[in-house]
Amino acid sequence: MQFDQVTVIGGGLAGSECAIQLADRGFAVKLCEMRPQVSSPAHHTDHLAELVCSNSFKSTRPDSAAGLLKAELERMGSVLLDCAHRAAVPAGGALAVDRVKFSELVEAEVAARPNIEVVHGEVTQIPEGHVVIAAGPLCSPALSEEVMKLVGGDALAFFDAAAPIVDVSTLDMDVLFSQSRYEEQGSGDYLNAPLNKEEYEAFIEALTTADRVVLKDFEGGDLFQACQPAEEVARTGKDAIRFGAMKPVGLTDPRTGRRPWAAIQLRAENKEKTAYNLVGFQTNLTFGEQKRVFHMVPGLENAEFFRYGVMHRNTFVDAPHVLDGTFAVPGTGVRLAGQITGTEGYMEAVATGLLAALNTYAEAIGAAGVELPRVGALGALVGYATDPATVGYQPMHVNFGLVPPLEDGKRRSKRDRYQAYADRALEALDAYLATRPDLFGGDRS
């Protein structure tokens, strides 16, 4: 190899996956994580791969973009996806994890590789040599400034908001009922808090008028739709959230035998099901207001909070115009990975960490970089994030809106069309992987 040492900055999802993949390819890796010496507004621990928002890695359905991404990552050998499966908790058709167990599994994978050196402490200057910056959306101000000097231009900022987590033993199970949407009562992975029209309207009034924690520096920022605070959604219209996080479709309140006017779903945070998060209720309300407002929800009147919702600033670069097709800063030994690239989502962060490792390895052995088929979930996302023609770049999840249309001209239902996208993607990926044994097979010389 032309070089065999790499510094990875950031011990989140992208950085952890990247470090493990590099180590498995013979590199000496220095994995730098600023916590616990320096924390962030959203982190609660000093563990690697801490999940700071939801504990869900989204759908596993093969006809969904999120499910397709997981299938692609499995074929590409993602270690963190395997950790997620081993830490999974019941969540219907989604892959949700016990966040503590997940971090423990990732740390065990890192510790099992003696060529990874974990260094705790803030990185304030980008080191010499080959570097992968996976500092995440909560990149420290000092390092953010260094990144901006490196790529030129200004960072873009948006907000993420995390949902509250409650103690299940303090919930009123005579009111809450267990059911996943469209499934039999009592057999679902979610708890549901039903509201009638009067309860819903009172709750929305309280939610939209409650005191918020909004710092002056945060004002005027963009709220990313996928993690928008519930109170902001509710402000767009009195029924907006009833057609979103509080939609009652597919649910039946066993007390009435009818569909409730609205409902809040709660999803298990751990395998023991002692803690539940309020699905879709990321919030920036003050802690006191969160307690007051959520205690208005039937079944949650006496709920005790393991964690209140928080809101934090995210930073990402204008990737299409400052990075190349491998997420490298042209003319440097630096690559970016994870949400700092503007690819949004847990599995997307894992994926870009994997790609950073693969492309760094390809560079070291003098091989071509990874060029995933654009018909795939990850290939389409990379294309969007690195195409200079992309205008008004904003954070993006994998979604089928990024993939090229089917070419056979057949009319299909939405589900059949998505399944056809997935089938096409996996066929193309399998064919591509077969052409790259240097990166994905046993031949890594």
What are these regions (language model features)?
Residues 278-343, 350-352, 370-388, 392-399, ...:
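A glycine-rich dinucleotide-binding beta-alpha-beta segment and adjacent secondary-structure elements
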Residues 20-81, 375-385:
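N-terminal FAD cofactor-binding segment of flavoenzymes
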Residues 395-445:
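C-terminal auxiliary extensions adjacent to catalytic cores
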Residues 62-66, 70, 78-91, 151-160, ...:
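A short alpha-helix-loop-beta-strand transition element characteristic
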Residues 2-14:
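Beta1/beta-strand and adjacent pyrophosphate-binding region of the FAD-binding site
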Residues 112-268, 272, 276-287, 291-292:
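Predominantly flavin-linked oxidoreductase catalytic cores and closely associated redox partners
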